[in-house]
Structure formats: structure tokens, C-alpha cells
């Protein structure tokens, strides 16, 4: 059974961030999960016209509405990514947070933890989670149990 289309909310503004996005997409592809990544569709030049900015914004909002769930990569706290998570939460759709590199015992933001159905702290944890979800045919809710800030 399909988990539906996921919206991949993530920054990609450095080579390291870009690689992480590609790694996440590879995990989706391994599990035959359909995804939308703004990085692949709607790139905006720094000096883009107002109409181009509005077009890209509207396109991303359209895809948020069309997606069944959202994967939010919190690394480096990209502002656009956090906006997308808040918007998606208002749509009352499930959010899975991804924060590779969060050390054991580190605090995770309360607002994000409370709005998400899962927090994955590594690619292997994301892979395992999606394996279990695809096997069950549904996203599985596993509320974050670590320390919060």
C-alpha cells in the first residue's frame, strides 16, 4: 500500500545540505515513496521578480495541499522549511521530522516534537521507520520521547 506523496521540506543552500536532501530522496526511492522536493522544481534567483517569487510561493503552497504528509529536515533551521512545517500543521496532516546529527540526550524543540508523528535522528532511523510504515501501509505515530526545549 502507498503512503501517498510526501513533501520534502529542507534547505539545500550548501553542498552539505544538498547532499543530505539527495540522501533523503534516496531513502524515499528505496521504499517507492512519491515525493515533491521544491529544490527540484522551483528554484528562485536572488534577484527574481515579484511575479516569479509569487509563482514559486504559490506552487509550493499547492504542493503542500496536494501532499499527504511532510518530511521536515530541521538541520540548520532553514526558515522556509520551518514555515512549511507550520503551514502543513495547520492543514492537520502528518509531519515526520528529520534531524540527522542530533546527539543522544540533546533537546528537540517542543513545538516541533508536539506537531510531529515521528522524529528521525539519522538516515538509518528514517529508513527503518519507512520500512515499517510501508509494511503496515500507514504512517506510524511514535511521539518523540527525548528531552525537549
Located regions from the model:
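Conserved catalytic or regulatory cores that recognize and/or transform ribose-phosphate-containing ligands
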Residues: 1-149
Amino acid at each position: 500500500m502507498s503512503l501517498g506523496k510526501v513533501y520534502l521540506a529542507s534547505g539545500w543552500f550548501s553542498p552539505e545540505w544538498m547532499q543530505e536532501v539527495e540522501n533523503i530522496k534516496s531513502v524515499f526511492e528505496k521504499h517507492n515513496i512519491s515525493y515533491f522536493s521544491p529544490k527540484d522544481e522551483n528554484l528562485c534567483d536572488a534577484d527574481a521578480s515579484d511575479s516569479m517569487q509569487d509563482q514559486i510561493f504559490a506552487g509550493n503552497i499547492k504542493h503542500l495541499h496536494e501532499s499527504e504528509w511532510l518530511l521536515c529536515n530541521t538541520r540548520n533551521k532553514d526558515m522556509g522549511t520551518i514555515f512549511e512545517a507550520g503551514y502543513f500543521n495547520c492543514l492537520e496532516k502528518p509531519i515526520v521530522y528529520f534531524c540527522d546529527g542530533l546527539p543522544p540526550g540533546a533537546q528537540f524543540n517542543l513545538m516541533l516534537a508536539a506537531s510531529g508523528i515521528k522524529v528521525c535522528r539519522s538516515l538509518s532511523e528514517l529508513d527503518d521507520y519507512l520500512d515499517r510504515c510501508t509494511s503496515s501501509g500507514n504512517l506510524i505515530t511514535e511521539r518523540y520521547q527525548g528531552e525537549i526545549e
